[in-house]
């Protein structure tokens, strides 16, 4: 019943003909995928979540605040052009982090606030990953790493992040594939406890 576009663009490749991003040097897509997906979601009574634009600056600098500026324009532009679709059901704030990251609280808060303000309060969510032992670079030779996050540190860092964003972010879907199977219960318990504390929904990914 739900379809989520995890990002509307990455660096120069975009899913819809954004006049703002085209001026910034992005490539014109051959098909307006956003219009296509929303039309199909309308047809099949599905709820569509729009994923924000990822400029790539965060991956290069580890500072999430770089993503705020472009998305100010993207959020307004997308809602004005596509917000009439009955299936447009919410927003995915696509900066994917795992730990207390520079600029994260400010970025999630500002982007979440704008998404909700333009769309009369449609829901927003994030999907960070848990920095477990399997969270290694795909380009590297190692399958695991020694310096994985502890449950206690994960709880401490995400308590601080949720405290700063819960007013404008409705749900959090932690990516759990980076931790070991026998760690799932402990992390899930903490995630649910934190979500309940701040009135957020706890999803998984």
PLM regions and their residue ranges:
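Glycan-processing catalytic domains of CAZymes
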Residues: 1-205
């Amino acid at each position: 019943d739900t379809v989520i576009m995890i990002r509307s663009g990455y660096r120069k490749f975009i899913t819809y003909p954004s006049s703002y991003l085209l001026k910034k040097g992005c490539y014109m897509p051959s098909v307006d995928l956003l219009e296509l997906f929303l039309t199909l979601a309308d047809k099949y009574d599905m709820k569509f979540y729009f994923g924000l634009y990822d400029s790539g600056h965060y991956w290069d600098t580890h500072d999430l605040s770089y993503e705020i500026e472009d998305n100010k324009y993207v959020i307004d532009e997308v809602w004005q052009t596509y917000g009439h679709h009955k299936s447009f059901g919410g927003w995915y704030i696509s900066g994917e982090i795992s730990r207390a990251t520079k600029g994260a609280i400010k970025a999630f808060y500002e982007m979440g606030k704008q998404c909700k303000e333009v769309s009369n309060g449609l829901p927003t969510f994030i999907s960070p990953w848990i920095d477990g032992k399997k969270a290694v670079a795909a380009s590297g030779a190692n399958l695991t790493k020694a310096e994985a996050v502890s449950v206690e540190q994960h709880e401490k860092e995400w308590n601080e992040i949720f405290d700063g964003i819960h007013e404008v972010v409705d749900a959090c879907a932690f990516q759990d594939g980076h931790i070991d199977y026998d760690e799932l219960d402990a992390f899930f318990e903490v995630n649910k406890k934190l979500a309940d504390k701040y009135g957020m929904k706890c999803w998984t990914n």
